[in-house]
Amino acid sequence: MSTPPRPLALLILDGWGYSEETASNAIHAAHTPIWDTLWDRYPHTIIRASGAEVGLPNEQMGNSEVGHLNLGSGRVIYQEYTRVNRALRTGSFFTNHTLTEAVDRAVKSDKAIHILGLLSPSGIHCHEDHIHAMVELAIKRRCQEVYLHAFLDGRDTAPKSAQASILAMQAKFTELGKGRFASLIGRYYGMDRDHRWPRIQAAYNLIATGQAEYEAESAKQALAMAYERGETDEFVQATRIVPSGKAPVQVKDGDVIIFMNFRSDRARQITRAFIEPDFTGFERLYWPKLAQFVSLTEYSKEFDIPVAFPSEKPQNTFGQVLAKLGLHQLRIAETEKYAHVTFFFNGGREQPFEGEDRILIPSPQVDTYDQKPEMSAVEVTDNIVKAIESDKYDVIICNYANPDMVGHTGDFNATVKAIETIDQCLGRVWAALQSAGGELIITADHGNAEKMYNAQYQQPHTAHTHNAVPFIFVSERAAIASANGSLADVTPTMLYLMNIKPPPEMSEHRLIELSSP
């Protein structure tokens, strides 16, 4: 068998979905001569990236974490969201040892339970049903003080859609006869993942001490006040909820915190602020001595905290297969998506494999990426081209963050510019691979930029989509693309193209079949 071309590069265009709808489609509106040429000239197909095809509930939109887990594992990975939902259906959630032990500890000491989480129906980082269930568990186990510190979405949901979630949560408190909102703040602050510590500090101070820019008697009133200030859900400033006759809530020594986000990347920073004795992100004016800090899922191997639903780590992932064969691989992305091409692509493994190099390009320090839609794509591309020219690597895996991160802003024109930036970068990578004799696969992890307006809410669409994503095989080898694939089929197909037999744990479906010479 002949030696396959090298390197084989995989470019993951984050948030570049496929849709034949042209209205509000930033990808369609953009000038993309390189993309158009590649799509027309080379074998291509579309692959599924949401719902059950990636281990999520039916009709659940995909996301970057899930997408990269499926891509790197080469199989469908059933997500924490699905596992928690199953526990709710069977009732085992309410007997989960980690959760019940934490609640019982607070009850025995007559202390408070503080529940943190993204109060959202999106199911990307958290789901409000899980928060409702946790409140119910705590109250039914006779906890007298149950407080919810709610992060608001507006990014994976419509920008102004939190009222329904707040009203549903308040109805749950009323039904149970106990519990209340303690604070509201947008996810922009409480769920930062790019080491913008002043944002986390605002959320930490709100939760830990009750310190806030604003105060309201109810969560509904707090949201209305934020809208009057011109804020959308994602950007709601720190607001403490203090009903008439009540005192502001703060976390006291001996209290228990339970963090209900199941996705780890945006949960880590604020968790560090609560659990690390030597935390240096900002100066904590007050650090409560908690009885326990419990996370719904594992946020980091470094965290010595109880986990309600421990991770299930896949074996024989794509990176592991390459390492076992002594091959060299490069992972590269800017800050916003670096964890996705490393930790998530490796099936939840923090450490690089043998022969795996990593390059992190800092994301620009701007408030929102519509201010700089090109982000750091040019610098990422500079490093990819150098890596190709070095002749060191057998495989290069890169994530371009722009379509997703700029798409999340809801700014159509900025997202068009982001797409055009990526198109120019594709041209440079393609040219470098042609000179080196390598091959290229282009795909995405989920949709976003192909839908920029929500007709139902009559406002910008800032969330992911349910759409399939493109897949292109750029090679001079004769090949045909096959249909009915998903993200789980991408890396098994890459192994096939490299003359490597995929391990039995991986998908057997190929997205490309090489033709006989």
Swiss-Prot record:
Active site annotated at which positions?
S64 (phosphoserine intermediate)
**Coiled-coil regions, chain positions:** none
EC number(s) reported in the record: 5.4.2.12
Which cofactors is this protein said to need? Mn(2+)
From the UniProt record, list the reaction(s) this protein catalyses: (2R)-2-phosphoglycerate = (2R)-3-phosphoglycerate
User: Which HAMAP family does the UniProt entry name for this protein?
Assistant: GpmI
Report the protein name in the record: 2,3-bisphosphoglycerate-independent phosphoglycerate mutase
Q: Which organism is it from?
A: Nitrosococcus oceani (strain ATCC 19707 / BCRC 17464 / JCM 30415 / NCIMB 11848 / C-107)
- Gene name of this polypeptide: gpmI
